[in-house]
Amino acid sequence: MKETKHITEGAALLGIYILLLLMTLFVPFIGLITFLALVVPFVVYTARNGWKSGIWLIVVAGVLSVLIGSPVALALSIPASTAGVVMGHLIQKNGNRYAILGAATGVFLLNYILAYVVAIVLFNIDFIEVMQEMIRESIQASEAIATSLGQENAKEAVAVLEESLGYTSYLLPTMLVLTSFVHAYFSQLITFFIIKRLKVKVSPFPPFRELMLPKSLLWYYLIVLILSIMAPEEGTTLFMVVLNLSFILMLLMTVQGFSFIFYFCYIKKISKAIPITLVILSFLITPLVYIIRMIGIIDIGFQLRDRIQGKNQGK
């Protein structure tokens, strides 16, 4: 009886998955939302029945995707199903929401790397080159318009953009990581919104103000900073490693800085509007980002929160 229930539930969830997949492939705009929701059937089934049952669902979903007849369908199925099963397994084990987010990001990243390699090896398509060519054409069109309007500095601006464009191939690892994180984050938001209504037990997301990155990141940041001062030759492996790690670590330090600002405002009972305004302003005022990043570094290295909390309790 229990086995029959599992099969029936699996069939129903596969039906929902195929519907979501078809909407993703053929319905504009709404397809973006259904694309992010593709993980949901796998999360629900695995959270209720375990990862072994989830693997069977991956296999069947893959076969059905092939039967649909589109390589894109299979390319969408593999990341969604594998990430969904991992998320469902961690939910079943009452995993922390940050752990679930990190695991989903890792699974999506592996899938994106695999897709990139397959595209180059089997189809001779380099997505970076395609993207660069599209951007280059857009820049040239903008230059032509600016020149026709009498903009004298158009060529200088285009030269700067062309130089920046050359770094996109070096930053491929960073782009893959950030894309994987964004995909995992929004998929998780949609998933948890739905599964709560299906009475699947999930742990709440810890407040952003409680985010505390490991202290070891400071050592990595220091090592990367020293390596960047050594100015490795452009195009070398060391150059790519330093460039990507610098970007990712600076981003993490900035996030830690924002977290501290939210924490400080919470402890001091300052309106949430203040930290939210700072986040918005940081996208508009570049020097503000440097200050927030420095706050993040100090927060990790010198345990600012403990000092503030101690002073607050002493009052």
List PLM regions with ranges.
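Hydrophobic, aromatic-enriched interface-forming segments
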Residues: 148-205
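Membrane topogenic helices and adjacent juxtamembrane segments
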Residues: 1-19, 146-154, 221-233
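Small-residue-rich helix-loop
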Residues: 198-252, 256-257
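Short helix-perturbing small/polar motifs within transmembrane alpha-helices
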Residues: 10-14, 78-123
